[in-house]
């Protein structure tokens, strides 16, 4: 370990859409989207548990929508390749229990306020982050980690990745010793495979056609340390190898540990749940501030009380990278962004059924998501003139 004492190494991980926790996230968000297609004002909190050939769908949904929850779940399993008993869960035959109730009236009375205002669905703290170290304004490690499992899954679905099964994980260590010239130190991938496979050929394919390919996409080095299935064998995976649960990949969903996290998960929750809407809003604000050149890195924390529309607090951290006075950044935020629940929902168009696409490979960095838009850059640049 002493050999790394002079290095500055940071690591993030991601998982594929076939990972058991991500299966649950996808089902939760697929149900949310199906409900929102029929009822944009629905209140949804949907959780999923997955194990060997079994799913439990539970939570609270108050809506006029009529949705076949079981069919939605089976469709998600099919999309991820779970159609074979050998994989531990079969979309066509697995048992599914539904335990859905209505939202508590005690919570409902705090959400629907007068004057078209919406109260926060719960108390809590949320964070959003942006950095200029990548084109997506996300930290490098999590960006590469997502791309690795996305690429591997895409090749598996196209039939190019021999022996690969749906369950995969990636882990990327970035060497920041030279802060202006980061490089990849280590890539770890654990990829489920068929029992009868050629280990040497399998690992060679991963290194040459996934790891090296992704590294080159980011114009980074390919002489990194490589770890592939370190235990030597990964046949039993998916919900059979490890139970899945909605909301258990909150760090991979966000910034890979590079920024703080308030603890609240996203998937399966409608936008009155500030765990989701406020985290998206914080990302939107931070990204626009960084893109406007007010700082190289920005993290925003907000807090809410149940039943109250406006945030209790807003805190901004720039890690000493701000290009203008910190008070100027606060001024820019307060004058241009409204963190009330109803305003966040309107600004980010959060009543639309857009959430399934967030349930895999991160909730941030995808250009077509409304909280990734850069529509405040010009107005924010004006604050550089008055600092």
Curated annotation (Swiss-Prot):
The lineage of its organism: Bacteria, Bacillati, Mycoplasmatota, Mollicutes, Mycoplasmataceae. GO terms for cellular component: cytoplasm. Keywords: ATP-binding, Cytoplasm, Magnesium, Metal-binding, Nucleotide-binding, One-carbon metabolism, Potassium, Transferase. PROSITE patterns: ADOMET_SYNTHASE_1, ADOMET_SYNTHASE_2. GO terms for molecular function: ATP binding; magnesium ion binding; methionine adenosyltransferase activity. Its EC number is 2.5.1.6. It is an enzyme of class 2 (transferase). It is found in: Cytoplasm. The gene is metK. Binds 2 divalent ions per subunit. GO terms for biological process: one-carbon metabolic process; S-adenosylmethionine biosynthetic process. Signal peptide: none annotated. Homotetramer; dimer of dimers. Mg(2+) binds at residue 21. Catalyzes the formation of S-adenosylmethionine (AdoMet) from methionine and ATP. The overall synthetic reaction is composed of two sequential steps, AdoMet formation and the subsequent tripolyphosphate hydrolysis which occurs prior to release of AdoMet from the enzyme. ATP binds at residues 19, 167-169, 233-234, 242, 248-249, 265, 269. Pathway: Amino-acid biosynthesis; S-adenosyl-L-methionine biosynthesis; S-adenosyl-L-methionine from L-methionine: step 1/1. The keyword Cytoplasm applies. K(+) binds at residue 47. This is S-adenosylmethionine synthase.
